[in-house]
UniProtKB/Swiss-Prot annotation:
Major localisation: cytoplasm
Single GO BP term: chorismate metabolic process
EC assignment: 5.4.99.5, 1.3.1.12
Location within or outside the cell: Cytoplasm
InterPro entries in alphabetical order: 6-PGluconate_DH-like_C_sf, Chor_mut/prephenate_DH_T, Chorismate_II_sf, CM_dom_sf, CM_II_prokaryot, CM_T, NAD(P)-bd_dom_sf, PDH_C
Family per similarity comment: In the C-terminal section; belongs to the prephenate/arogenate dehydrogenase family.
MF terms in GO: chorismate mutase activity; NAD+ binding; prephenate dehydrogenase (NAD+) activity; prephenate dehydrogenase (NADP+) activity
Keyword Oxidoreductase part of the UniProt annotation: yes
Listed Gene3D superfamilies: 6-phosphogluconate dehydrogenase C-terminal like domain (1.10.3660.10), Chorismate mutase (1.20.59.10), NAD(P)-binding Rossmann-like Domain (3.40.50.720)
Domain of life assignment: Bacteria
Protein name, entry field: T-protein
Amino acid sequence: MNEKTTSELEHLRGLIDGVDQQLLHLLRKRLDLVAQVGTVKHAAGLPIYAPQREAAMLAKRREEAQTMGIAPQLIEDILRRLMRESYLNEKDVGFKQVKNDLGSVVIVGGKGQLGGLFQQMLRLSGYQVKVLDKDDWQQAECLFADAGLVLVTVPIAITCDIIREKLTQLPRDCILADLTSIKTEPMQAMLAAHKGPVVGFHPMFGPDVGSLAKQVVVVCHGREADKYQWLLEQIAIWGARIVEAEPECHDNAMQLVQAMRHFSTFVYGLNLCKEEADIETLLKFSSPIYRLELAMVGRLFAQSPELYADIIFAQQESQHAIGDYLDNYREALELLKRGDREEFINQFQMVAKWFGDFAPQFQRESRMMLQSVSDMKTN
């Protein structure tokens, strides 16, 4: 570059830096306003996430961006990231306490990651929370004495044993609930162990979420739903969406959503390991979609093997779903071995028809995710 070009670039970059500084000040102002919104919501007991308000605001900003010659998707991307930050800030303000005469909440397994998250959310809502972990059972009678809610969040393999052996003497009006990722057996165990209100939850997210806004919590009703309705309202105030399900229906879905998915991810990682694949080389030649897939595989192996063993081995029925997947894999491999391109296309079209309108919807959603993956690449 010649001296004139260098000078012009430095001048323009200086102007851009100035605009960026203005953006920072505007962001700070917006976050301060969000904090005020959080305070008002806290006082009124309003949910942290208001989907209609969010959708209307995004539609309006997209329309305004179009008028100004700015790509609508650009402003939507920026605003969605801002809203995620806003939900985190609103959470820190705290939440309205729906049930102010509850007594204490006892979290069995509260020193675990998910137990810790619910401990934080309940305390932000003004509840007195006590933790009972594996070394605290000698204090159990004292801890349970004034309990209005006992929340079980222990490894799946010992959940039912803990319920049957340790939770049979709770106060009659105490709510017994669990956060286990399977529901049929824990629900049966809770209903047998406790004569009072019983409800089962499955949070469809990990403990590393910064906010419950837009997250899903599955609820399986057990007994005396009117006694724990306040708890559903409290979870909704945290921003989560409540999805009701029968335990058996939930567990059947989890065979595909969790057990088979995690198992196939495990096998894919195992195959990469046994093939002695060089991850740096794979990343160097990866497309955004493969980088995302590899990230999801790596994410699994960054977490607790005991947790995923619990999920995969929890249901005997999962073996059937995984076995069906393996059979379909073998059949598809036979197509490849035979060189039957025509039948491959026929089956591809059959699956595309089965997906229906979801296929283009998922294509749009994944396009945005892949663009985000590309943005994060540094080399």
